Regions:
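Active-site helix of classical SDR
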Residues: 102, 138
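N-terminal Rossmann NAD(P)H-binding glycine-rich loop of SDR-like oxidoreductase domains
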Residues: 10, 15-18
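Active-site loop immediately N-terminal to the catalytic Tyr-X3-Lys motif
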Residues: 127-134
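Substrate-binding pocket helix/loop in short-chain dehydrogenase/reductase
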Residues: 78-79, 86-88
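Conserved NAD(P)H cofactor-binding loop of Rossmann-fold oxidoreductase domains
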Residues: 70-75
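Residue(s) in the substrate-gating loop at a strand-loop-helix junction
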Residues: 122
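C-terminal helical subdomain
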Residues: 160, 164, 177-217
Length: 240
């Protein structure tokens, strides 16, 4: 039985991925708090705060064959209402943590053996995201990091790549204050695992249905699309 490591797997899409993988892999979830549900036999949990200065915990998991990083958070708000501590914590958890974890597993990525690695980014990293400016900035940095590292991996002759998973809003998670609903996240989890296993480097859920047009509008006139995004968020009812 192969081993998989899910960072941020206690809820949302991370939990759904962990549960799907547990059907045929031994899975370890690393997160700040444990899942609120009882876990199958093949899933273990280790507590870790991604704001910790010591990431040595990941050196004890070098035997995994799959790494999926899903940890992250955001706050929908005007920038004037965002605290400086929120800015620091956002980059630490959303960006720096993922980069540090990849560094701990980089020898595995460079090696000749299959190592499946993916990171939850966001469509917000592909365009301006007013009222979500800090979150979008953390994800934009992560997007460029992944693209850059994938070029380095290719040029080194490695068969491995990092999968950038960049969805819009995902139903069935507690990201926007809702609750976990596996009925709404399981299908997406299966799709992500499929892209991981085929070593794709980018997966944008609902690309053809929604985001191809959105990205094209942004490319054509990023100012107008930014205003549209601002108005859409205000009308969404998610502003606190």
């Amino acid at each position: 039985m192969k081993k998989a490591l899910i960072v941020g797997g206690s809820n949302g899409i991370g939990l759904a991925i962990a549960l799907q993988l547990s059907d045929y892999d031994s899975v370890c979830i690393i997160d700040k708090v444990p899942p609120s549900m009882s876990l199958p036999t093949h899933i273990s949990f280790e507590s870790f705060d991604l704001t910790s200065p010591d990431y040595g915990i990941f050196d004890h998991h070098q035997d995994v064959s799959l790494l999926m990083i899903t940890a992250g958070f955001g706050q929908l708000a005007h920038f004037q209402d965002v605290s400086e501590q929120h800015i620091i914590d956002s980059f630490q958890v959303n960006t720096v943590a993922a980069i540090r974890i990849v560094k701990h597993f980089y020898k595995r990525l460079l090696g000749p053996d299959d190592f499946f690695c993916g990171i939850m980014v966001s469509i917000a990293g592909f365009m301006s995201s007013p009222l979500f400016a800090v979150y979008g900035a953390t994800k934009a940095a992560l997007k460029v990091f992944i693209e850059s590292i994938n070029v380095e991996l290719e040029m080194s002759g490695s068969p491995n790549r990092i999968l950038n998973v960049s969805p819009g809003s995902i139903k069935g998670t507690n990201f926007n204050g809702g609750g976990n609903n596996l009925n709404l996240t399981t299908e997406l989890a299966k799709q992500i695992i499929g892209h991981l296993k085929t070593k794709n480097d980018l997966f944008i859920p609902q690309y053809e249905e929604v985001y191809r047009e959105v990205l094209q509008r942004y490319h054509n006139d990023f100012r107008a699309e930014g205003k549209h995004s601002y108005e859409y968020k205000l009308k969404s009812g998610r502003m606190k």
